[in-house]
Design a protein with these regions (language model features):
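A composition/biophysics-driven feature that prefers long, compositionally simple stretches
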Residues: 1-168
């Protein structure tokens, strides 16, 4: 891929240190006010229970999918896989590319876990340099806590997914 660690592309202009430091300061907190739990939560719980009973003792992994390139550095609007939306209740506007829903086996059936790419931090340059996830490029994403409140699922960062899957 043509992206660096901070999400910038090889043809993006250099990021002077002064600009990077300036862009990290002075941002007001912008929590989402009045998050209402999704009306889909009761339906999702039933769907998860049925899926859990179908695969006892097995780990179930349902990816949301990724972005599809339209032309060069332009992507089509993201649409999560239908199975991901069905089992999480996450609607189009809240779906984040590369998210993964997992049913992890436990003594009670399964634990439902959602791995997402959370809102960009102001401690890095990602929020204004990363064309794939940066808030200036694609808009505000929900934090882990906001997603958990709205959809009633345990939420973790997608960056932790590989480590989670390797700890069988």
């Amino acid at each position: 891929m043509n992206e660096s660690k901070d999400g910038s592309r090889k043809y993006d202009a250099a990021n002077p240190r002064g600009l990077a430091e300036f862009m990290k300061t002075g941002w007001a907190p912008t929590p989402l006010e009045g998050i209402v739990p999704s009306e889909a939560i009761p339906f999702v719980k039933v769907r998860i229970e049925k899926l859990s009973k179908k695969y006892p003792g097995k780990r179930v992994i349902i990816p949301a999918g990724g972005l599809k390139t339209r032309s060069s550095d332009t992507d089509y609007r993201f649409r999560a896989h239908s199975a991901f939306s069905y089992f999480t209740g996450i609607t189009a506007g809240d779906a984040v590319p590369d998210s993964v829903f997992i049913l992890e086996p436990n003594t009670n059936g399964h634990e439902a876990l959602l791995f997402i790419h959370p809102r960009s931090s102001r401690k890095t340059t990602e929020f204004y340099r990363d064309a794939k996830y940066g808030e200036f490029w694609v808009g505000r994403r929900m934090t882990l806590e906001e997603t958990e409140r709205k959809y009633g699922l345990a939420v973790r960062q997608v960056e932790d997914l590989e480590k989670f899957l390797s700890n069988e």
